[in-house]
Curated annotation (Swiss-Prot):
Keywords: Cytoplasm, Methyltransferase, RNA-binding, rRNA processing, S-adenosyl-L-methionine, Transferase
Record localization: Cytoplasm
InterPro entries: KsgA/Erm, rRNA_Ade_diMease-like_C, rRNA_Ade_Mease_Trfase_CS, rRNA_Ade_methylase_Trfase_N, rRNA_adenine_dimethylase, SAM-dependent_MTases_sf
Function recorded in the entry: Specifically dimethylates two adjacent adenosines (A1518 and A1519) in the loop of a conserved hairpin near the 3'-end of 16S rRNA in the 30S particle. May play a critical role in biogenesis of 30S subunits.
Keyword Transferase: yes
Organism: Ligilactobacillus salivarius (strain UCC118)
Record's protein name: Ribosomal RNA small subunit methyltransferase A
Lineage start: Bacteria, Bacillati, Bacillota, Bacilli, Lactobacillales
Amino acid sequence: MANELPEIANPTRTRAIMETYGLTFKKSLGQNFLTDINILKNIVAAAEVSEEDNVIEIGPGIGALTEQLAKRANKVMALEIDDRLLPVLADTLSPYENVEVVHQDILKADLKALIAEHFEPGHKLKLVANLPYYITTPILMHLLDSGIEFETIVVMMQKEVAERLAANPGTKAYGSLSVAVQYEMDSEIAFIVPKTVFVPQPNVDSAIIVLNKKKVKPKEPQDEKHFKKLVKGSFMHRRKSLWNNLQSLYGKDPETKEKMLQALEVADIKQSIRAEKLTVADFINLSDALVKMGIN
């Protein structure tokens, strides 16, 4: 039975698992194992996981978070890139019949196909993960661009990156990543995780960020690809005005500049403003105005 052994995140059991399988941490995969059961339980609580939910986990490691998810979810599909960990997970998660471990790289995986293969329809879809710091942003953007409708995404990441995701317009942390994420989801930091609860200990603290499906989505831009190009380009040089960044993005010839000025006027945005002052809605309005002027 699952209750006969200490939970996987118990520091003594974590060490025993590492020793049994001769595991060392792969720096190239950004591996840090969490050894505080209360924090794991708080992550699951932040995702509000229930038996109605199918949950995807990225990078289960030795299964500490997976175990907590399995106790509450309908089913868990855990994607693990490190083939050394597959026999470990087969062992540590053997008491839980509602877990499937899939040997996949999240950035190369066909998530829609995996969801269709491993989950029965009729359940809410959530994603919970402790992401490697070095690849957090590419994974998040991959998920948001996938077209998959996640009810909730709860991710542990570097505190500084979490602050950027949840930042409000006009703050130092607000940037293209803030806009890209907040266009799709509502974001908030649930709590901070000190670096001392990891093995090996990272150099910085982490944060748990909760992304929830928007109850009221902003109006969609006429050209989503252009909208994303505009957002990225507007923050190209943070200290420069939006106008300077627009010229770098679209060109400085008189006709283009005139069209850009007209688009700014239509969107009711001042020429001298910096990108960090614009809301998601402002960027959508400006993108639509530029497209209408033939700039994309």
